[in-house]
Amino acid sequence: MSRVGKLPVAIPNGVTVTVTPDNVVTVKGPKGELVKAMSNKINIAVEDNSVVVTRDNDHKDVRALHGLTRALINNMVTGVNEGYVKTLELVGVGYRAQLQGKKLVLSLGFSHPVEMEAVSGVEFEVEGGTKVKVKGIDKELVGAVAADIRKWRKPEPYKGKGIKYENEVIRRKEGKTGKK
């Protein structure tokens, strides 16, 4: 039995979970609604304030899907109830972020500003010009948008300049030593 998959997903107050016969899970909550199609190899049932995920057989691929399905449903329930936030920090001289409507404009040392449109389901928040918060109810989408922002200037190991996640530790390197 999957250690993750055998745990039921608790449904908090204000959140409703519905499962169609073809395993399409719909989760509605105070922050919005998420719909996701799950594998038909897994059984999903809503039983008194919890979602129970079970499997029919012990094939390797079904065992893998068991824990995955439970984790995805848990992420959906948490997302519509609390939401997800990824915080990025811009480290470097002249590296700035600002909002223009729903568009995020980054100055990252290029000859042009980098503009990113907010994807539906994700919103940006800028604090002090050097911190960008990516907020949304879909964990996968929030992480993907944050990774797209970080991709423009990954932190470099010598001075630590670039865009990094808030709690990310940059492994630093020693520079070259001069000739004597």
From Swiss-Prot:
Keywords: Ribonucleoprotein, Ribosomal protein, RNA-binding, rRNA-binding. It comes from the Bacteria. One of its GO terms (cellular component) is cytosolic large ribosomal subunit. InterPro entries: Ribosomal_uL6-like, Ribosomal_uL6-like_a/b-dom_sf, Ribosomal_uL6_a/b-dom, Ribosomal_uL6_bac-type, Ribosomal_uL6_CS. This protein binds to the 23S rRNA, and is important in its secondary structure. It is located near the subunit interface in the base of the L7/L12 stalk, and near the tRNA binding site of the peptidyltransferase center. This is Large ribosomal subunit protein uL6. It comes from Clostridium botulinum (strain Okra / Type B1). The keyword Protein biosynthesis does not apply. Belongs to the universal ribosomal protein uL6 family. The keyword rRNA-binding applies. Part of the 50S ribosomal subunit. GO terms for molecular function: rRNA binding; structural constituent of ribosome. One of its GO terms (biological process) is cytoplasmic translation.
